[in-house]
Regions:
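Active-site nucleophile-adjacent alpha helix/oxyanion-hole segment immediately C-terminal to the catalytic cysteine
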Residues: 1-70
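Ser/Thr- (and often Asn-) enriched beta-sheet segments in non-cytosolic proteins
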Residues: 16-18, 109, 134-136, 182-184
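A general structural signal for short secondary-structure junctions and capping/turn motifs
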Residues: 23, 111-112, 127-128
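Conserved active-site-adjacent core of cysteine acyl-enzyme catalytic domains
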Residues: 43-115
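Short, surface-exposed coil-to-beta transition loops
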Residues: 114-120, 130-133
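Short beta-strand micro-motifs enriched in acidic
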Residues: 122-126
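Catalytic Cys-His active-site segments of thiol-dependent hydrolases/isopeptidases
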Residues: 127-150
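Noncatalytic regulatory segments and standalone regulatory/sensor domains
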Residues: 143-186
């Protein structure tokens, strides 16, 4: 990846907010990373690739927004599942952008599962004076923000060079089980 274009957190949002495992839904079930990542992914897709972090910043709003249905996840899995090595995240993301272009779609999202954590990726093609390929990486342990990186048409091939290490710190890689097991499920 270009050293001039690393994923970054928005300065407009509070990266210290962590509601993972700290709030319950209306039925008293604890809301974990898998629930938050799934909700973020659905929110991203249903709002043209945009996220309003008001809900993700508030324990009360998040507990109202997410209703846990444990059986639901197994019935709503998308058709494609990828086992991805830490060094190969960019290849999968690049191919998803190519698929979006081919299908004339502007955005999609997918959940990312490691042995110890669930996260999400939102990708979108932003059509302005220069097409931008935008990647949003969401970690529920930073509930009210996401990391963002974009590439222009002239450097889209640089996406292939993205790795898990570009999005996650050494500490997170270890905590999420990605140091010992270098595969994620997309």
């Amino acid at each position: 990846m270009s050293k001039n274009n690393p994923p970054y957190l928005s300065k407009k949002r509070d990266a210290s907010i962590n509601l993972n495992g700290k709030v319950s839904d209306c039925n008293g079930e604890i809301i974990w990373c898998r629930h938050i990542a799934s909700y973020w992914s659905e929110f991203f897709c249903s709002n043209s690739g945009k996220i309003d972090y008001e809900t993700f910043s508030s324990p009360q709003l998040l507990s109202k927004a997410i209703v846990i249905q444990e059986n639901k996840g197994t019935n709503n899995i998308k058709g494609d599942v990828f086992f991805v090595e830490n060094e190969s995240w960019g290849s999968v993301i690049y191919n998803l952008f190519l698929q979006l272009e081919k299908e004339n779609k502007s955005h999609t999202s997918l959940e990312v599962h490691s042995p110890g954590h669930a996260m999400a990726l939102g990708i979108k093609i932003k059509n302005d004076k220069e097409n931008k390929f935008v990647i949003n990486f969401y970690d529920p342990n930073q509930t009210a923000t996401h990391k963002r990186v974009f590439f222009c048409t002239n450097n889209i091939c640089d996406i292939i060079n993205l790795t898990a290490y570009d999005f996650l710190s050494e500490q997170c890689l270890k905590c999420y089980g990605l140091k010992e097991d270098t595969l994620s499920l997309f």
